[in-house]
Amino acid sequence: MIELSGRLLCETAGDTALVSALLPEHIALTRAEPGCLRFDVQQTADPLVWSVFEQFRSRTDFEAHQMRVKASSWGLRTAHIKRDYTVTEKA
């Protein structure tokens, strides 16, 4: 199993509005992917910071997710927003 955890770090209220607008579709598409066990993104007490937690069944599933995201509206339109993620492999 692959887990990703960390934060999405917006710099402006405009970035936060963009994340809020695009996030529902991004969550729905990700949760429908083969191998997605869990996908949670939530705004923290700081409105510019979002907590992210993902679990995928295998590295192959996780890598397929990463490829889809890069080409998606979410990936293209939020590429400028800083990510602070840790990826770990669990038995």
Model region roles, listed by residue range:
Residues 17, 41, 84-86:
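Amphipathic, positively biased hydrophobic alpha-helical segments used for protein targeting
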Residues 42-44, 88-91:
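Conserved beta-strand termini and adjacent loop/short-helix elements that scaffold enzyme active sites
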